[in-house]
């Protein structure tokens, strides 16, 4: 396999908390795919956990879009970049719609995702291989 794309993103958790407070449901619906909503709802009881959840997802999606070489927009919508976890807890990236088509154009066969967060920031790193 060879690497076709690498992307990383660093997000300030407080910025996502402010967006969530300002736009509420509209923001989460624009950011999260239906498969991600349950994870968000599980953390929604605590503002800090909810903001960290959203920041991790946003960082992962931005990193994935950068690895695809297109950024967030017509070729990769936020809800088309889906972050879930394996039963062991490892993060997984799935692409649908236009994001999947962009990945297919690049010949992507495998996506590797790493996500981390600390008190104030969330970080994600994506490697795409063909």
PLM region descriptions:
Residues 1-130:
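Core catalytic alpha/beta fold that binds nucleotide/phospho-ligands
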């Amino acid at each position: 396999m060879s690497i076709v794309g690498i992307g990383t993103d660093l997000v300030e958790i407080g910025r996502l908390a402010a967006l969530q407070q300002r736009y509420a449901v509209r923001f989460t619906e624009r950011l999260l795919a239906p498969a991600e909503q349950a994870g968000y709802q599980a953390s929604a009881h605590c503002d800090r956990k909810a903001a960290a959840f959203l920041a991790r997802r946003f960082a992962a999606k931005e990193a994935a879009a950068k690895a695809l070489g297109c950024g967030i927009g017509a070729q990769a919508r936020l809800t088309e970049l889906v972050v879930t976890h394996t039963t062991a807890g490892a993060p997984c990236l799935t692409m649908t719609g236009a994001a999947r088509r962009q990945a297919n154009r690049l010949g992507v066969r495998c996506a590797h995702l790493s996500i981390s967060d600390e008190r104030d920031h969330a970080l994600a790193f994506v490697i795409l291989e063909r």
